[in-house]
Swiss-Prot record:
Origin organism lineage: Bacteria, Pseudomonadati, Pseudomonadota, Gammaproteobacteria, Enterobacterales
Gene3D superfamilies noted in UniProt: Dihydrodipicolinate Reductase, domain 2, NAD(P)-binding Rossmann-like Domain
Pfam families from the UniProt entry: Gp_dh_C, Gp_dh_N
Entry keyword Nucleus: no
Reported effect, H182N: 10-fold reduction in activity. Increases affinity for D-erythrose-4-phosphate and reduces affinity for glyceraldehyde 3-phosphate
EC number: 1.2.1.72
Alphabetical GO biological process terms: glucose metabolic process; pyridoxal phosphate biosynthetic process; pyridoxine biosynthetic process
Domain of life: Bacteria
Record protein name field: D-erythrose-4-phosphate dehydrogenase
Gene that this sequence comes from: epd
Purpose of the protein: Catalyzes the NAD-dependent conversion of D-erythrose 4-phosphate to 4-phosphoerythronate.
Length: 339
C-alpha cells in the first residue's frame, strides 16, 4: 500500500522531506496529500524549487490556487492555525509529519489524531509521554501497531546514538562528553538584534556562538544507564548546513584507535549500512552537504588516550540526513500498523 502523508510545517525539514521523497525514489511507497503552512503558497513553491543549501529541485514545481504540484502530483495546501481544524479525516491521512519544531507534546499529537490522522511523527524531540522516540537504525524494531504518536528525536541524536551504541556494545562505555558544532539556524540573527538568549542577539555570520542543548538528555533517553554520566555542549558556527559532533567516551576495555576505526568501518558496511558511513578522505563540512546518512565517521580524527579514552569526530547533514530518516520511520510506522 501507499502511505498517505500530510506535512504540518513547511520549513527546512518539511521541504527537505518532500525533496528526499522524490529524490530517493520512494514516491510509490509514500504520497504527500497535503501540506499545512501559514506562509503563502507561492513562497512555498519557490523555496521548494530553489534552495541555497541543496540547489535546484530536479522536479517541476508549480502552484495553482490551493494546490502545489510536484511533477504531476497535486498536493493540497492549507493555512490552518488550529490543529483541530485540519482536514486529515477528509483526506484519509495515514501519518502526519509534524515538522513545525513547535509542537511535540502528547496533547498536540492527540489533536492531529482527533482531526482524523491515524499516526503522528514529530520531527523533533517530544515529551516523555509519547508512545515512542525512534532513532532509525537503532530502535525502529520496537515500534508497535498501537504506537500512534512518535518522535524522530533530533538530527544530532540520530547522528550520535548509532556511534554510541557501537562503542558501548564493543567496549563498554563508562561516561562521555559531546560537543555539537552545529551550523547556524533560523533562531539566530542576521545582524545584532534582540533575543531572549543574549548570545543569540549576535550576528550568526560573525561568531561561534555557544547555545543550550538537550542532547545529553536525548542520549540518556536511549541509554538510561548513562544517566548523570553523559554531558553535552553545543556551539553554532557561521555555516548554513552540516554539523560535526565531537564525541569523547571512557570505556572499560582497552582499545587502540585503529581498532575503533575498524569497528565503525565494518558497521558502516554491514549492520548500519545506509545509516552510518565511514571516510578517511581529507574532507571538510561542505563535502557532506546532501549526504543521506545519519552519521559519517571521520576516521582521520579518531584518537585514543591511555587505552580507555576514545575521541571521534562524526559529521552529518543535519537537514538532508534527518529528512531521509523521517521517511524511513514513516514507512516503519506504517509497516507495523497496516500490515
Amino acid at each position: 500500500m501507499t502511505v498517505r502523508v500530510a506535512i504540518n510545517g513547511f520549513g527546512r525539514i518539511g521541504r527537505n522531506v518532500v525533496r528526499a521523497l522524490y529524490e530517493s525514489g520512494r514516491r510509490a511507497e509514500i504520497t504527500v496529500v497535503a501540506i499545512n503552512e501559514l506562509a503563502d503558497a507561492a513562497g512555498m513553491a519557490h523555496l521548494l524549487k530553489y534552495d541555497t543549501s541543496h540547489g535546484r529541485f530536479a522536479w517541476e514545481v508549480r502552484q495553482e490556487r490551493d494546490q502545489l504540484f510536484v511533477g504531476d502530483d497535486a498536493i493540497r495546501v492549507l493555512h490552518e492555525r488550529s490543529l483541530q481544524s485540519l482536514p486529515w479525516r477528509e483526506l484519509g491521512v495515514d501519518v502526519v509529519l509534524d515538522c513545525t519544531g513547535v509542537y511535540g507534546s502528547r496533547e498536540h499529537g492527540e489533536a492531529h489524531i482527533a482531526a482524523g490522522a491515524k499516526k503522528v511523527l514529530f520531527s523533533h524531540p517530544g515529551s516523555n509521554d509519547l508512545d515512542a522516540t525512534v532513532v532509525y537504525g537503532v530502535n525502529q524494531d520496537q515500534l508497535r501497531a498501537e504506537h500512534r504518536i512518535v518522535s524522530n528525536a533530533s538530527c544530532t541524536t540520530n547522528c550520535i546514538i548509532p556511534v554510541i551504541k557501537l562503542l558501548d556494545d564493543a567496549y563498554g562505555i563508562e561516561s562521555g562528553t559531546v560537543t555539537t558544532i552545529h551550523s547556524a539556524m533560523h533562531d539566530q540573527q542576521v545582524i545584532d538584534a534582540y533575543h531572549p538568549d543574549l548570545r543569540r542577539t549576535r550576528a550568526a555570520s560573525q561568531s561561534i556562538i555557544p547555545v543550550d542543548t538537550k542532547l545529553a538528555a536525548g542520549i540518556t533517553r536511549f541509554f538510561p544507564q548513562f544517566n548523570d554520566r553523559f554531558e553535552a555542549i553545543a556551539v553554532r558556527v557561521p555555516t548554513i548546513n552540516v554539523t560535526a559532533i565531537d564525541l569523547s567516551v571512557t570505556v572499560k576495555k582497552p582499545v587502540k584507535a585503529n581498532e575503533v576505526n575498524l569497528l565503525l568501518q565494518k558497521a558502516a558496511q554491514g549492520a548500519f549500512h545506509g545509516i552510518v558511513d565511514y571516510t578517511e578522505l581529507p574532507l571538510v563540512s561542505v563535502d557532506f552537504n546532501h549526504d543521506p546518512h545519519s552519521a559519517i565517521v571521520d576516521g582521520t580524527q579518531t584518537r585514543v588516550s591511555g587505552a580507555h579514552l576514545i575521541k571521534t569526530l562524526v559529521w552529518c547533514d543535519n537537514e538532508w540526513g534527518f529528512a531521509n530518516r523521517m521517511l524511513d520511520t514513516t514507512l516503519a510506522m506504517a509497516t507495523v500498523a497496516f500490515r
